[in-house]
């Protein structure tokens, strides 16, 4: 199986909207079918302890994301969406803290609709509809933003982003010191 790697947040592919997916795109990127791509995406997401991952986060031009798989989210339900589209969302919004594999240690309070309905193709190419609520809804909306070329840092003011970035830098420095201290023992 092909190993996928996260690309840095300043890579233009992370900030570029992705064209619709077609199966003939797979071969030029060394995947034999949707199932192999889906498996590679879940493997990469799990390697970095994520709960969602979009193809452009690993440098692939596929309109596809994977989400879930964590036991505390919808009972561990995992989903892969090809060519997803939000067809409706609730009026009720929730403010929650979000993170992103593209921006390690950065957490931001983001307001999103509590519920949404996605239309998408599954790993077998069949058209599906998912009525999502709560955390799974939030994850899929976050990943859908990536497909549109938007990142979660765009949902907050520059002041809030700077404050969160400073906090992330402190956390990274704290972890480095911890690692150095434990390696010396």
Outline where the language-model segments fall.
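Positively charged
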Residues: 1-185
């Amino acid at each position: 199986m092909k190993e996928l790697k996260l690309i840095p947040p300043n890579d233009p592919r992370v900030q570029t909207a992705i064209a619709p997916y077609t199966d003939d795109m797979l071969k030029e990127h060394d995947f034999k079918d949707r199932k192999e791509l889906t498996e590679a995406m879940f493997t990469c997401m799990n390697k970095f302890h994520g709960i969602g991952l979009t193809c452009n986060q690993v440098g692939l031009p596929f309109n596809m994301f994977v989400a879930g798989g964590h036991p505390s989210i919808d009972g561990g339900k995992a989903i892969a969406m090809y060519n997803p589209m939000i067809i409706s969302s609730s009026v009720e919004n929730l403010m929650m803290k979000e993170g992103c594999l593209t921006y390690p240690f950065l957490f931001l309070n983001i307001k999103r609709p509590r519920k949404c309905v996605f239309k998408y193709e599954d790993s077998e190419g069949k058209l599906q509809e998912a009525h999502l609520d709560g955390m799974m809804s939030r994850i899929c909306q976050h990943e859908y933003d990536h497909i549109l070329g938007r990142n979660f840092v765009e949902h907050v003011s520059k002041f809030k982003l700077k404050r969160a970035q400073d906090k992330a830098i402190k956390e990274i420095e704290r972890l480095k010191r911890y690692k150095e201290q434990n390696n010396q023992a």
